[in-house]
């Protein structure tokens, strides 16, 4: 069963910042591919959110081609997944959400 996915404002800002970074420092194509990779990962999470708990109550799904982790939690009773943050793995892990 697919879960409803809600993306937090913080995660939206993370996505926007990452997109702009790739667009400015690589190319529009790389930035667009980043968004495609993110969407594929969201689909995987939506279909099966039972990833290992990585940090507090958050689970994490790495993107395939980009050094980012999608931190999320889910409510099994309500069938809702909350995307909390999209964290760049090259940053300090002490700053995890």
PLM regions and their residue ranges:
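Basic/aromatic recognition patch in beta-strand/loop cores that engages polyanionic ligands
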Residues: 50-78
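Basic, Lys/Arg-enriched alpha-helical interface segments
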Residues: 1-57
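Enriched for short, Lys/Arg-rich terminal
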Residues: 73-97
């Amino acid at each position: 069963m697919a879960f409803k996915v809600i993306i937090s404002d913080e995660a939206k800002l993370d996505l926007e910042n990452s997109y702009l970074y790739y667009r400015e420092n690589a190319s529009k194509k790389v930035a667009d591919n980043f968004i495609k990779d993110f969407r594929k990962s969201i689909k995987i999470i939506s279909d099966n959110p039972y990833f290992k708990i990585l940090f507090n109550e958050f689970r994490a799904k790495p993107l395939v081609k980009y050094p980012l982790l999608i931190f999320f939690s889910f409510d099994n009773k309500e069938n809702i997944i909350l995307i909390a943050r999209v964290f760049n793995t090259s940053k300090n892990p002490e700053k995890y959400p």
